[in-house]
Amino acid sequence: MQEDKSFLGTQPIKKLLPKLAVPTVIAQLVNMLYNIVDRIYIGHIPEVGSLALTGIGVCMPLILIVSAFSAFVASGGAPRASIFMGRGDGDSAEKTLGGCLTMQVIISLLLTAAMLIWKDELLYLFGASENTISYAADYMGIYALGTIFVQITLGLNSFITAQGFAKVGMKTVIIGAVLNIVLDPVFIFALGMGVKGAALATIISQAVSCAWVISFLCGSKTVLRLKKENLLSGLRLTPPCIALGLSVFVMQASESVISMCFNTSLLRYGGDIAVGAMTILSSVMQFAMLPLQGVAQGAQPITSYNFGAGNSARVRESFRLLLTVCLVYSVALWGLVMLFPRIFVGMFASDTQLIDFASRALRIYCGAMFIFGIQISCQMTFVSIGYALCSIIVAVMRKFVLLIPLIYIMPQLLSDKVSAVYAAEPVADSLAVIFTAVMFAVNFKKALRKMDEK
């Protein structure tokens, strides 16, 4: 196994990162379409598009929770498996894969039950109003049934990428995304199912992707193979995976809490149109974040493998290249958003009033987008080298310590309450990047020094 993956420790980083990152970025871009295509179609439903879009936006906290729980296990399990491979311990790597799958199945069943039992209560908690609850409930009632497919697809695909099979991981996303894009207009418009059709198209697409992932990991081309005997015996290796994945879980789950805070505050100060605009803003933010995460995921096998192999020079070079690429991307996208906000907003809505409102809000909300590259590079490198505590602290600082309080503090400081709520995002991002950069500089140097001493 070590021989199979030795290219991670020998090929030039500048050639290796594009080789792994480009397919992952493409997969993330397609995954972005996967996540937002429902919103694009729903926002253009005649007569009810704006309210239906707002209803889907209210569902986002629950959808984010589902994604976060897949990361809870897999985002720690995949780097752990890479580290085991770097050490030549293939058996432990495969047990990690099996144990993580079992954990994901258990979690998905619990999540499905909770969402079906307390569906309406959760949707009202996350910002639904009497005008939007019916659309939100129709979508969530169907989407919840596909939770297990989402969990397994997102979770196991991380293990495919961690082995260096970036193109296979890309195909996983493309298969589901293309199918979803094709089925959405059929179910929403042709069959007249509306938001229910969007949810049904999504879970069918995820089920097909799930079947693809499992078939690959049970096949002959994979290095890490999914085996029945590891499903239970591998559970003993999952606690370190969960500890390492906790920061990514916090980062993603906190998006759910933050979405709830934004929705309820905006509903209070600006009504349904402000919540609908937030659905659009969060979609554009996904556009910014997913490719950054794709590059970081492409760098993860390189960093983790070389960290496990004790090659500090390649770990350092991997981070520097990751940081450069992420910064260039985030600055370029920030410029486009500032110059052409109506183009981004117009993808999700046809209502003139909503487009005008959301375009103004987008410039405020994405004001600090140009520094996202620093945050993502540092946080994901912490995960890649197994620094679980540092990655948790960074995630908690940005989301819980800064952003959530600012959502409620900013409206007390500014006369324009709605704009103040949106402004909480760039203020929190700026402060978080300063904190993260300082913490990373100190701890990354220590990690490299320890590697050199060994």
Locate the predicted segments by residue:
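Short alpha-helical transmembrane segments in multi-pass integral membrane proteins
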Residues: 1-24, 81-148, 190-245, 303-368, ...
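Short runs within selected transmembrane alpha-helices of multi-pass transporters and secretion channels
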Residues: 71-74, 143-161, 172-177, 198-211, ...
